[in-house]
Amino acid sequence: NIDRLAADGTLFRYAFATTASCSASRSVILSGLHNHRNGHYGHLHSFHKFSSFPWVKTLPVLLAKAGYRTARVGKHHNGPEDVYFFETKIKANSRSTVEMANNCEAFIKAESEKPFFLYYATSDPHRGGGNANELPHKPNRFGNKPNKGAYPGVKETFYDPAKVTVPPFLPDTLETRAELAQYYQSTSRVDQGLGRLMEILKKNGKWENTIIVFTSDHGMAFAGGKTTVYEGGLHVPFIVRNPYQEKRGNTNNAMISFVDIVPTLLDFAGSYDAQKRAAKPELTTLPGKRGAKKGPYTFHGRSFLSIIAEKNPKDWDAIYASHTFHEIQMYYPMRVVRDRKYKLIWNIAHPLPYPFASDLWAAPSWQAQWKKGQSAPYGKKTVREYISRPQFELFDISADPNESVNLASSAKHAKVLEEYKAKLKKFQKDTQDPWIMKWQYE
């Protein structure tokens, strides 16, 4: 079904999350602002929770003002509620993807002159459900039911660990393969939920006037993916089906990121001004360094609506990323600039050991290598290199897509390093990043 959506729309090959942490990333998806600006620095939980500032204006709120009905189903993970307000909350088990889609049908087909915005967010393929102790190597279940059980309407797909594809940032071990088999099974439920949602749109006459954006909040829930700003954490699947585009099955090489989603959907909805930067008059104030200041509310991204049908659009050649926390105790701020040639990571708190999300630390795929010692391989790095990181990591991403050779200390690349540091500083200044002061004070 994911492939069918791509065949009827546009596949973006270079789409990126701006942080690889669930709450923070979803805050960017819905606000169009990097999380260091919207305040959602990390996870929303009942203890010491992060949440966005009260002044942040999010996509569901803006679309409601523009005359849209709004609803969400599944995983939300953002706050406060009034900032991320959806008029309708549809109940469903966020692992039961077909049930989620079915429960959305009443909202989709409701008789109304208003158009609708639906935020369909699964918990799959996040880790969860404990470990499958009955299986070799005791992999995390990734939400899969024990004993080959199935969720309502889902035909569970089972994978042979010996035959799964192992991404290069992971170690090719029995433990990794066992976990990937569970991960891919969980992902197959997402595919089936999407398929059911597509059927419901067609059945109710909404397919030909509904734009669909399909993506993941970040990369795979494995060490080297989630919580990192390596390619495994930031590079995400991204498909857009614009019902009005003539060219179908398009592959687009524009570099886009999650800050571009809100501007694009507001553009499609007609709630965007001619400058393609600031939304219409209801957006009039944005707090500045010394309190509120008058002026247009400017998003950090831009609309890609006009280039969806293109293959190699001009001036879409760089993205920026910003990660600060996962959980409250997992502080490790990183800032990133990545273009076609180079990628620079600034590990602001580099003297600290890299912190682990609890589920990633406990993962058999990580623990197996950790127990072998600091020199044990983990993907293209060692365990030691994964945990202890330098201040700067500079990669020739065009020649070294697996980020295996750090060029930051190379005399040959000294000028490149300074050039990309300057790009990061400008990005931080433009987006009012509080961590910009770390250039001066640390």
What are these regions (language model features)?
Residues 28-118, 123-131, 138, 142, ...:
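Catalytic-site neighborhoods of secreted/periplasmic enzymes
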Residues 2-9, 15-25, 30, 34:
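N-terminal catalytic scaffold of extracellular/periplasmic and nuclease hydrolases
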